[in-house]
Amino acid sequence: MVIILSFALLCLLSASLAWIDIRHGIIPDWLNLTIAGLGLSKAVILGGPFAGLEAACEGAAIGAIFWLLRRLYFTFRKIQGLGLGDVKFLAAAGIWVGVAGLPMLLLVAALIALACAGVMQLAGRPLHAQSSISFGPYLALGLLFASGFQQYWLCC
């Protein structure tokens, strides 16, 4: 029951995140914190306090890695390649899927973003090297896919 309820809430929060990021180009801190808190609560309820600590450490490590990648990209290119809200979201997502689920999350997000960019290009919207897109909705879909896959895989 906890798994189903937490996943349903994650779906609702992810939809909110996608809508806000598409509309305003930001991912609010309160939303990232809510997703992180829900993931930590789920980990503690299902696995105990040490599972929550492990999930928190994995989320923090993932957030730190992507923050470093963001800084390195800016250092070399002098433009932002990944928003800070995306970095914080990846840290929160890391609590949900851990290091093991991160490749699936990123692959799904990148493939969906690439497909959408291709559709936009075919529809006549010109995309250039400096074009920016809101990556949060794609990360949210990647999180839902990776989390759903992990929960199904572990339950069945």
Predicted region positions:
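A membrane-topology feature that recognizes alpha-helical transmembrane segments
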Residues: 1-156
